[in-house]
């Protein structure tokens, strides 16, 4: 890392905020409603891109932290970001929905726990 102060709390906060936005945008929806609403799809994809970019920054700038926290799917989040950002109209919304339902709640919990552990001041 450079001589600048650690950006880790910022990156963790970006992930948390993006997950919370996705949850808000999809609240009350089932998969069929999500598939019909391209506006929500676009907003969700944008926030997945934020998650992936923040995870890439953690991997790049804080490799020791990343190594100490294998429970955080940092590489997977970045890979998903790349698939979404470069997939254009080939994105599988079923995979996106499954990720929202099955993976984001546990990722949010893990990010909050890590943030509390490092004292970043994020909401727990």
Residue positions per predicted region:
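Solvent-exposed interaction patches of small proteins and small membrane subunits
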Residues: 1-124
């Amino acid at each position: 890392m450079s001589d600048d102060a650690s950006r880790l709390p910022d990156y963790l906060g970006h992930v948390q905020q993006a997950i919370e936005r996705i949850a808000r945008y999809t609240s009350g929806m089932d998969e069929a409603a999500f598939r019909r609403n391209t506006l929500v799809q676009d907003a969700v994809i944008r926030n997945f891109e934020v998650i992936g970019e923040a995870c890439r920054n953690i991997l790049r700038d804080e490799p020791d932290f990343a190594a100490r926290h294998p429970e955080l799917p940092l590489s997977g989040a970045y890979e998903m970001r790349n698939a979404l950002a470069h997939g254009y109209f080939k994105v599988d919304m079923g995979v996106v929905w499954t990720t929202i339902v099955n993976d984001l709640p546990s990722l949010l919990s893990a990010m909050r726990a890590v943030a509390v552990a490092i004292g970043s001041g994020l909401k727990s």
